[in-house]
Amino acid sequence: MVGVVGAEFQQEILFAFGGGDAEISIAVLDGPVDRTHDCFRGARLVPLDTAAAAQCSDGPATAQGTHIASLIFGQPCSSVEGVAPLCRGLIAPIFRDDRAGCSQADLAEAIELSLDHGADILHISGGLFERRRQPSEKLIAAVARCNLRNVLIVVSGARDGCGGLLRRAGATRLLPVGAIDRRGRLIGGGDARLHEIGIAVPGAALVGAALEGSNSVRRGANYAAALIAGVAGLLLGAQSQHGQTPDPGAAGEAILNSATPRMAGRAQECQRAWIGRANIEAAASRLTGVHQDTAAASPFGRWHRAQTSSRQSDHAAFRPRA
């Protein structure tokens, strides 16, 4: 597998299919988000009133939630450009600055609120979750609603993720995402129980929003999963562009089936990976039944072709900037 660092992968997939669709909603279940950051100016963000949202301050949970949200919803030509800036974002905090961890009750509440507000995709970061092994009745009920609504749940595939818990709760449309470095090695390990249903993507040196208006570089499965949640939103937008009904469950299957084989270090590591735009195009073609060219679908790609009259580069650096 060709070595790709996270920042390169992040740039490769920017503005595929024009940046998404306002009718597609992606819920971010992580820490609170500092929506005053310049990258969110113009973003369609809807804060949800979860238990964790009432206890936010400028702490580690808010820093992580802000970085995660910017990877998806950061606006074009801002200091952080996200994968799906035109999609609608539902901010449903589950982690608090004043307390470590997330209870099953808080997780279930955030899922339910996200569904009430029309979420098509859930992104759930890893962290300290309640150690109780069996899912609660409330969490099982929330997951059942996700299954009924055909909602795709994208989770961190790291050891501290909640993918195993959600699987035991009955989740049928679950996509764990692990992070790999330039040499293809998993960053921070992975949940061996989920290796056969997930993918790995470059997750080192991902640039995102930080507190007090600055930017920072982070790495790990939480951030890699955010990129794939954004990509899933792009795929649903591509379906809409072709007059098809968005199908989150099918989008998850298309992501899995368009992955590149990965030479994993261990048998219980994820055997599939995404490394660039070619994977998005393959997934979109599988999902829509129509050959997809992300550059042709994007106004930024059309701009470059008009300016250069040359072969379109796949790299997102070739786009107009304000």
Task: Give each language-model segment a name.
Residues 13-46, 56-104, 170-173, 183, ...:
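Subtilisin-like serine protease catalytic core
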Residues 32-35, 78, 95-98, 127-131, ...:
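Solvent-exposed loop/turn segments at secondary-structure junctions
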Residues 73-77, 112-120, 144-148, 179-182, ...:
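Sec-exported extracytoplasmic/periplasmic mature domains
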Residues 94-172, 214-225:
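Substrate-binding/access-modulating region of protease and related hydrolase catalytic domains
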